[in-house]
């Protein structure tokens, strides 16, 4: 998902040290170690999980970013040096089943639960998603381009900007589903400032951003409706090392998931990236606002 530069204060607030050192058997019998990636959103979610778990009675909860690649995370959950990590349903499913064709939220979640190896579990998924979007400028949207199907016949006149791997993963699929063949596909970055600048300047007319990106509304960009579900669902879901959380702790994280919407997650990202708020304060405010603190 979208890459953010982690400020030093973020790491200090979350706790220092080797994220995969120590650990133990987790919350059901000991410490709970929450992993977070080198993405601001992941750290915010980890701090929200930590606050909810502490409120549920967990005595020793630590957030230790960054934990590295998904392969590293999976290994750490297997040996229980990590207890739980916030993740994304579609990406997790594709990791465990590279041949999956599921795209809708409930289909992705159901298949993910089926494909998880022994020793893992996913808790309830949140309504919140941070998934790929195709976005356009207001002029193109005003000309009648509101959906991917609207975009299809216009693609030959439009330049697209997105990450380097976009062509290998999506070029053939968008052609098959929507008849879309872009005039040119330019490599920008993964939903970051290079992509935003290219769309603002008109160097590209269509771009891949993420659904919780604060830059969409800030720049007047218009997200298109993926009316045939090309991009898979990416609901926020806790990935847990089985046996590391008590029933009360599991219930606490499920309550967090039930409360977390895409709109709220977008707002959390704005508070972090644009307002430069401390992630601990953001997490505490989220929990209080959603009545998740006793």
Regions found by a protein language model. Name each.
Residues 28-42, 59-65, 156-162:
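Short, well-ordered beta-strand elements
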Residues 40-60, 78, 172-176:
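Short, polar/charged alpha-helical segment
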Residues 11-15:
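C-terminal motif of bacterial Sec signal peptides marking the signal peptidase cleavage site
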Residues 105-160, 258-262:
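A conserved helix-loop-strand patch within extracytoplasmic ligand-binding domains
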Residues 96-123, 203-206, 215-228:
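Ligand-binding "clamshell"
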Residues 132-141, 234-247:
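A bilobed periplasmic-binding-protein/Venus flytrap-type ligand-binding module shared by bacterial periplasmic
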Residues 16-20:
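Bacterial signal peptide processing site
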